[in-house]
Amino acid sequence: MADRQSLEEALRRIWGYDHFRYPQGEVIDCLLARRDCLVVLPTGGGKSICFQLPALLGEGLTLVVSPLVALMEDQVQSLRRQNLPAACLHSQLSRPERKQVLYQLGQQQLKLLYLSPETLLSEPVWNLLRQPQVKLQGIMLDEAHCLVQWGDSFRPAYRRLGALRRGLGRDKGQIPLAAFTATADRQQQNLIVEGLNLRSPECFQVSPHRPQLHLKVKMVLSEYCRRQQLRRFLLKHLQESGLIYVRTRTMAINLAQWLQERGFDSEAYHGGLGPHQRRQLEQKWLTGQISSVVCTNAFGLGIDKPDTRWVLHYQAPLMLMDYLQEVGRAGRDLQPAECLTLVSEPTGWLDSGDRQLRQYFLSQASKYLQRAEVLSQQIPSQGNLGQLKAHFPDLEMALAWLHRRGNLEWLDPFNYRINPGHYQANPLEELKSQYRLMTQYLTTSRCRWQTILVAFGDNSPAARRPCGTCDNCLVGRC
């Protein structure tokens, strides 16, 4: 295994940095020793170096499982600019491009291959990875919090990743598996470890505290008041880059149109846009052609604009983990940034929008769980996903719910076995618990950063003293 001096020489040669930041060196040592790890590192903490450096120094191919195309392309382009052997594989590639990457994979010409969980588990890619000539060095799961997310953004393939090593066979089954995320509390960390079947992982965690982010929550009495607060906020931040987060596609479209009618250069970004439209809009915002984007949580991962001066939550996220991810888009240049969340008054009598939104997402989650229970009575107790998908709609989602609840075991990424009555968890109750945490944050009179850090089990000095910059601290409540 390489010593720290040779690792720092490689760091200097490839990236131009003289020294590692904690815990980069420790994570790299762990991976080079072929041990599993879980890394919770705030946005901008340099997590990509943790898996890119050992991949480039070691022998064989490192797979990087990533949720979004923009995230993959950004990192691969950066590596290619330095003539490093990296590629990404996703559904938006042309047929010749895809063929070229598969050829490079088969010929062992790559050190890093970025791909989504769905692409990884597709038949041509999986069969190629199982070939004896393809030597694997490790599997890195980026944005690992996706494993514990539910709702519209949930992707069932994540629940099958824990069976990767078992499916790859005896020789390749000994490779290390690492999970990286910017946000995960203790419960979510445990879920990630269990869901991925990490083997006695080393855990590295850095405080999520971002002192340059000034957190504020403002109560509104009606939809009209909410829009007027938004308008006043934007007038205060003219010529500054920022993001307006909403929870639904319809709201993104309607709110962007309302802003355009009032002269603001804002556009809507959501999951319904095609790949070309998404890239075009991302570039317009990154290059300053527009100052703000009204977006759902489809926007953000892999988009790095250091001078983002504000984030406004027109509708609050339902989970504290999502909130921390989204405000983390601001202030990456370490300069002060304002993060404002607009919320309905607590009773919901005058403006029931927030309450209805929570009820809607809980209702959707409940429907998924009910569907899973019905399907579990209809499908064979043991079976192959590919053979059964055509006969059972929503099979993948149902199997993911059953796996999360402890009723199902993946024998490999394609074959399952149901364990009836073997309940380990109630996903719906866990979701309600996460919603309550978010509500506590929005209604607290304590320091907002302290509230977040306590919720995430952070023991740093920042968790023991008021931040001095949030709205509660500024009015003397802390």
UniProtKB/Swiss-Prot annotation:
Motif (DEAH box): 142-145
Domain Helicase ATP-binding, residue spans: 28-202
InterPro entries per record: DEAD/DEAH_box_helicase_dom, DNA_helicase_ATP-dep_RecQ, Helicase_ATP-bd, Helicase_C-like, P-loop_NTPase, RecQ_Zn-bd
Known cofactor(s): Mg(2+); Zn(2+)
SMART domains on file: DEXDc (SM00487), HELICc (SM00490)
Residues that, per the record, bind Zn(2+): 447, 467, 470, 473
Presence of keyword Cell membrane: no
Function statement: An ATP-dependent DNA helicase which unwinds DNA in a 3'-5' direction.
GO BP terms in the entry: DNA recombination; DNA repair
Any GO CC annotation of this UniProt entry: cytoplasm
Domain Helicase C-terminal: 229-380
Cofactor binding remark: Requires Mg(2+) for helicase activity.
Record-listed E.C. numbers: 5.6.2.4
GO MF annotation list: 3'-5' DNA helicase activity; ATP binding; ATP hydrolysis activity; DNA binding; four-way junction helicase activity; metal ion binding
Family according to the record: Belongs to the helicase family. RecQ subfamily.
Protein's name according to its UniProt entry: ATP-dependent DNA helicase RecQ
Alphabetic keyword roster: ATP-binding, DNA damage, DNA recombination, DNA repair, DNA-binding, Helicase, Hydrolase, Isomerase, Metal-binding, Nucleotide-binding, Zinc
Entry binding sites for ATP: 41-48
More details: Cyanobacteria do not encode always the HRDC found in most bacterial RecQ proteins.
One Pfam family, short name: Helicase_C
Domain of life: Bacteria
Source organism of this protein record: Synechocystis sp. (strain ATCC 27184 / PCC 6803 / Kazusa)
